[in-house]
């Protein structure tokens, strides 16, 4: 009896070793990419840029459409540029826009959603950049490194602004005409 018990225990312990794997096709993964011949690459420090916008009083805005008194500068550095590939480069900015004003990016408050403020971007000539559109102006590629300068500025989009921390998520893409 002890032999049968020992044999049974041995069989149970060995069953995972001799078990055959069973494979069931459950789905597929489609991976897609793109091979591009870009004229420039984005420098590492510009790939995940954080711009500190500062602090503003709600009474600094005179109503919907009014801008904050301060423009905050920021730059995007491009490297490994080659005029042999492309002669000009532009930057397109994309992100969520508020229904009240599609010419600015949404500025969301912590836990409140729309804070009543939008974020406007401007090029180096202080021309407003319209979100989710192709660039209106392109810079010539003259050297292997170049820095494109921009400014950001808050704009009231509502009479009702909610004080608190606010943030905007904006993505950029290099565009070659």
UniProtKB/Swiss-Prot annotation:
GO-annotated biological processes: cell adhesion involved in single-species biofilm formation
Keyword Signal tagged: yes
Gene Ontology CC: one annotated term: pilus
Paired cysteines (S-S): 40-81
Record localization: Fimbrium
Keywords, in A-Z order: Disulfide bond, Fimbrium, Signal
Signal peptide: 1-19
Protein family: Belongs to the fimbrial protein family.
Alphabetized NCBIfam families for the sequence: PRK15200.1
Protein name (Swiss-Prot/TrEMBL): Putative fimbrin-like protein FimI
Organism: Salmonella typhi
């Amino acid at each position: 009896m002890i032999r049968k018990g020992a044999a049974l225990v041995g069989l149970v312990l060995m069953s995972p070793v001799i078990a055959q794997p069973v494979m069931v096709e459950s789905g597929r993964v489609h991976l897609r990419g793109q091979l591009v011949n870009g004229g420039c690459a984005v420098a590492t420090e510009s790939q995940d840029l954080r711009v500190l916008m500062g602090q503003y009083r709600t009474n600094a805005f005179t109503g919907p459409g009014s801008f904050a008194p301060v423009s905050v500068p920021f730059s995007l550095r491009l490297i490994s540029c080659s005029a042999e590939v492309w002669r000009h480069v532009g930057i397109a900015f994309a992100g969520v826009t508020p229904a009240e004003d599609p010419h600015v990016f949404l500025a969301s408050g912590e836990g409140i959603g729309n804070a009543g403020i939008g974020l406007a971007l401007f090029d180096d000539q202080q021309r407003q950049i319209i979100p989710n559109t192709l660039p209106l102006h392109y810079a010539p590629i003259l050297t292997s490194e170049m820095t494109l300068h921009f400014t950001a500025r808050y704009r009231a989009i509502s009479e009702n602004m909610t004080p608190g921390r606010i943030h905007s998520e904006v993505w950029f893409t290099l565009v070659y005409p």
